[in-house]
């Protein structure tokens, strides 16, 4: 009975953490978009990675010398994914628009949700969530195949981000793995950040917006997602990520005074219904439920 109560409370905490990370991510995305005119997408991504590393490394102080080969490889891959995931999404938005870019990117967590669940309920919830995302974003057809390709790379990166975080969470205690990956990613982007600061000379407003994006869209979600994926299975996390377009729509309506039409509200209702069903309906034993169970040290 005690173990069941602990599992239930852990699941609730994981869901709340994932949703909190998603909210922070969308607030950070809004902040980062305000910096685009001053330093461009590449500059914003570089500053985001640098800010996240400047916060996490001194606080966490990861013991990198103690990491084994089995711990190092997912950390190194995650460091690459951090930058690729954000940069390709921003570049896709520039070429094909926000709606199509976000829809393409959501294919990543959707694939994780579909491939890591063995039940019909999980697959149906994922499909409903996908329909809701399309209703909100309303992607338009395009012949910009490079933009589509960038969106699909962002999708693959998001899927890899989920799976790598789950692996790191089972092999490295605390948030040392995330902090280490963030530091490596920052080193990779440091020359780019310096070059952009010298050549574009962004104003203070753009810098502050980029720094805000680094805190809200990188530091907080990176840690929150790692913690959440220790408490909930990857297929549920993938479905929960469909809440991102909903949060983006609400933030746009509140902060940017954007209007939500009937189709957008239908999309929001579909996503809320899919997430509610995923949380309440029995989902059986997902493929990832026992992954790494014998390796966890924390």
Feature map (PLM): residue ranges:
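Hydrophobic alpha-helical transmembrane segments of multi-pass membrane transport proteins
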Residues: 19-27, 31, 59, 76-91, ...
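Membrane-interface interhelical linkers
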Residues: 1-20, 52-77, 118-123, 141-142, ...
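Transmembrane alpha-helices of multi-pass small-molecule transport proteins
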Residues: 14, 31, 37-84, 107-112, ...
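Glycine-/small-residue-enriched transmembrane alpha-helix faces in small-molecule transporters
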Residues: 1-43, 80, 84-88, 131, ...
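C-terminal-most transmembrane helix of multi-pass membrane proteins
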Residues: 2-7, 242-298
């Amino acid at each position: 009975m005690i173990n069941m109560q602990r599992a239930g409370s852990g699941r609730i905490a994981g869901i709340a953490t994932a949703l909190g990370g998603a909210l922070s991510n969308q607030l950070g995305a809004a902040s980062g978009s305000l910096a685009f005119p001053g330093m461009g997408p590449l500059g914003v991504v570089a500053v985001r990675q640098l800010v996240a590393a400047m916060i996490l490394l001194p606080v966490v102080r990861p013991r990198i010398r103690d990491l084994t080969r089995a711990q190092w490889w997912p950390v190194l891959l995650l460091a690459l994914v951090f930058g690729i995931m954000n940069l390709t999404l921003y570049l896709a938005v520039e070429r094909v628009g926000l709606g199509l870019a976000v829809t393409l990117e959501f294919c990543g967590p959707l694939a994780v949700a579909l491939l890591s669940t063995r039940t019909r309920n999980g697959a149906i919830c994922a499909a409903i969530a996908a329909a809701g995302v399309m209703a909100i974003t309303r992607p338009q057809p395009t012949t910009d195949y490079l933009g589509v390709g960038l969106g699909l790379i962002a999708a693959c990166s998001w899927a890899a981000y989920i799976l790598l975080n789950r692996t790191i969470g089972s092999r490295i205690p605390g948030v040392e793995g995330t902090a280490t990956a963030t530091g490596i990613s920052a080193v990779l982007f440091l020359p780019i950040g310096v070059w952009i600061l010298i050549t574009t000379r962004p104003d203070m407003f753009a810098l502050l917006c980029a720094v805000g994006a680094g805190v809200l869209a990188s530091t907080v979600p990176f840690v929150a997602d790692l913690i959440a994926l220790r408490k909930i299975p990857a297929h549920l996390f993938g479905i929960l990520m469909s809440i991102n377009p909903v949060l983006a729509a609400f933030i746009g309506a509140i902060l940017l005074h954007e209007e939500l039409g009937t189709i957008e509200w239908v999309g929001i209702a579909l996503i809320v219904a899919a997430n509610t069903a995923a949380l309440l309906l029995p989902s059986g034993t997902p493929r990832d439920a026992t992954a790494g169970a014998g390796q966890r040290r924390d």
